[in-house]
């Protein structure tokens, strides 16, 4: 299978459980299909302010009924128009200090038990609900987590907390489905042994995972999906002219 994909993050910010528009996505998927596109990366959680049952103390009880119903429609359309979905389930936006629930998300990611609640009450139900669909091909555990670590407005959290979430979620997804796992890293410097370390390498994720709740051998990403922008060229080169060794 050859993917010819696009980034189609949202129609309306926080579509799922919020302002989901069936007609928009139907028209969009039809246009993609007619243009020879067969895959789309979609943010099914944009910043966690809509569709999520999260308390101020970071306790996570799951997604709303509306969120699941909107996703039911999305995956129905994906099958109708043969669009393979990469579902992004978190972003640095969750942690930005202008968002309603930013402190709750920061607490969740820094509290191991509450991270487990997010995995148990959202990640696992997600892959169990849609994992049998031929058109649910991957989960992107976070969009550009680099900014959570680097930016004051996102809390400048430690990589350890993020890595522990990725390790737990990846292990849970692999234990419950055949859906692939990735993290949409914002910069190659955090996805490279020769720069500032590969924060999502197999060894890194399996090292930070403790206890016996998760199978360590399942804590890995299936592929890398690092982002690239033109402003990066002077620092890290052009990806299509560099080798993996470079």
Task: Annotate each predicted stretch with a short phrase.
Residues 1-235, 244-245:
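Active-site mouth of glycoside hydrolases
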Residues 240-242:
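Long, structured stretches of catalytic cores involved in phosphate-ester chemistry, encompassing
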